[in-house]
UniProtKB/Swiss-Prot annotation:
It is found in: Mitochondrion outer membrane. It is a multi-pass membrane protein. It comes from Homo sapiens (Human). Forms part of the preprotein translocase complex of the outer mitochondrial membrane (TOM complex) which consists of at least 7 different proteins (TOMM5, TOMM6, TOMM7, TOMM20, TOMM22, TOMM40 and TOMM70). Interacts with mitochondrial targeting sequences. Interacts with TIMM29; linking the TIM22 complex to the TOM complex. Forms a complex with BCAP31 (via C-terminus) which mediates the translocation of components of the mitochondrial membrane respiratory chain NADH dehydrogenase (Complex I) from the cytosol to the mitochondria. Residues 1-71 are annotated as: Disordered. This is Mitochondrial import receptor subunit TOM40 homolog. GO terms for molecular function: porin activity; protein transmembrane transporter activity.
Amino acid sequence: MGNVLAASSPPAGPPPPPAPALVGLPPPPPSPPGFTLPPLGGSLGAGTSTSRSSERTPGAATASASGAAEDGACGCLPNPGTFEECHRKCKELFPIQMEGVKLTVNKGLSNHFQVNHTVALSTIGESNYHFGVTYVGTKQLSPTEAFPVLVGDMDNSGSLNAQVIHQLGPGLRSKMAIQTQQSKFVNWQVDGEYRGSDFTAAVTLGNPDVLVGSGILVAHYLQSITPCLALGGELVYHRRPGEEGTVMSLAGKYTLNNWLATVTLGQAGMHATYYHKASDQLQVGVEFEASTRMQDTSVSFGYQLDLPKANLLFKGSVDSNWIVGATLEKKLPPLPLTLALGAFLNHRKNKFQCGFGLTIG
């Protein structure tokens, strides 16, 4: 299932409800305001979160591809994953923009309960403090999965982001997310996902209001056609006073041992990504986006260099708008410290932005 609630404080007002925007079921094409899941651990970097979870990408890609090959050999089709995950593997290679200084302290109170404190200082936006809580239940499904999961984050202004994830049965998972802005209720979202042996179906309901007659309903479906090829689609229905509409998108994903190609085509435009695992240390990705509404296209190239022996993770990117960015994450053993540095340069606008982050625990 995709991410649905932002770990950062909500924007100054309720986000506008364009149809695809309320579906934060990822992260992103661009992440809609208020709909990205905060990481279960602490965050790194300044002004944003950068976790080492992406380090598992190479192994996951190889395991997924080898599993697909084995399924094909026995005549079975593999589960294709979720619709929101189609472009995620490529996007994880790109550095996340950082600005200012950020300090995060993580503290595990038990095997199931963790808290974290985050202080962010910025020269562009507002400086803030966040308190986060994560609870992971005792229903163990795999070495890396346990349910229910409760995640909450509150900032110094009293704005809250929270969500609950639970496995209701074999293949059936549900999630509920809410967001408040100080004393005002801003967003809420409920979704359910079912994973079959060779398909995944999901339904999301966002901000339903029976009295006003507004809300967003999103349906996703992804089906394995061959051990390597999966096809699916997305249907978004949105309604509010004086406006009603439907947006449909189709998606295709082709996976081999060391690369993955994905394309999404719909009324809003086209989104294509290519991920390639060059070696155990190097991964590269290319992303193409075309928007019919903005009448604009862009191409981005990103790569990730992982040096486990040096406890170093580097990400870099450049796009067709001449924006160059890079982040460096360095663990400092034997101390429980992680240092993050980031810089972005926009050549067209002559703007430079950098950030520094330190995570303890």
